[in-house]
Amino acid sequence: MKRAVLPISTFSLMFLLSAATAQNSSPTGGGAQNAINGINSYPGPEFVKYEPEREALDRRIDLFLNDWQGSMPRHEHGSLVLRDILTRGDNFAPSEKGAVLHYGNFLAYGRLSPWNSTLPSRLERQQEVFYILGGQGEITAGSDTAALRKDIAVFMPANLEFVMRSTSAEPLVMYVINEPTPADFHPKTKMAVKDESAGHQRTPAGGDPYVVPGASGHWGHIVRELFSPADGLATEQSVITVTLNPLTMGEPHPHRPGQEEIWAAIDGDSLAFLGTEIRIQRPGMAYMLPPDASTIHSNINASNRPAKFLYFAKFPDGDNWRHGAPAATR
């Protein structure tokens, strides 16, 4: 059954923002200014700039948020059933819901039935990341075999034959990220397997009074690293998880053209703050912020348990975008 995407009054958001500002009344400092890859922070909330008037078509934000339950099933690698969430389209004006990707090929929800296996397959001119959401299984590529369970991530390079198997009475379910490879790209010859719980946890990039304990930036983002170009990514530049502890939120901020950043919910319900709208985001839902340098976004965890996201992104070429910082006060 397709889930309803519920608009929420901005009153609750304003309450949360006011509370966050009251609790973080430290004096403004130089702080970390690097605005890429989720490790930055504005020097202070005063640097978030809002449009002077409400965008007449701002409810178009619903085109940038999608749920796999609204998609028709298709098959990949034989018996792996995919339900698309985000697909190729336009970063700014998608022709249909979820058709927002310019660089990546797709983000889908995958399901392998109990005790089933895929056909021996090779990815041609494309690569995939499998992030396991539930079930038990194993994957074999070349001479390597790895066990699959919740929060195991697998990077499968192009041209490497592999087989995935479900080894329990529960379906093996996952997010599937698919990226293209350029013509002159030389893929890795082995798959990479990461246990998310053992991934490197980032620390703050600079002295920011607004970052909560344990987070690495954007106020409340707890980041664990999965895959980067060093692991073999061709188009995407970062695959990580981001966790928000109970009653915390990310720093509202925009993205500039060329930044394709995806947030797919893994655990917990949260609030996606997009432009001037709020939507409930549940596991199985993902969004991309329009990278127009003015529409802001944040993820808000108003619950009593952690909320975790799978994040992947392509950044503008040569990106070192910086926000201006106020002069230090004496």
Residue ranges of predicted features:
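Bacterial N-terminal signal peptides that target proteins for export
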Residues: 1-9
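Bacterial N-terminal signal peptides
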Residues: 8-18
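A short, N-terminal "cap"/entry segment at the start of jelly-roll beta-barrel domains
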Residues: 24-103, 184-238, 320-330
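Conserved short histidine dyad/triad with adjacent acidic residue
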Residues: 87-96, 108-123, 240-256
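Glycine- and acidic-residue-biased ligand/ion/polar-headgroup-sensing regions
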Residues: 125-138, 258-271, 275
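Short acidic-glycine-tyrosine-enriched beta hairpin
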Residues: 143-158, 276-292
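Ligand-binding loop in jelly-roll beta-barrel domains
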Residues: 158-184, 282-285, 291-318
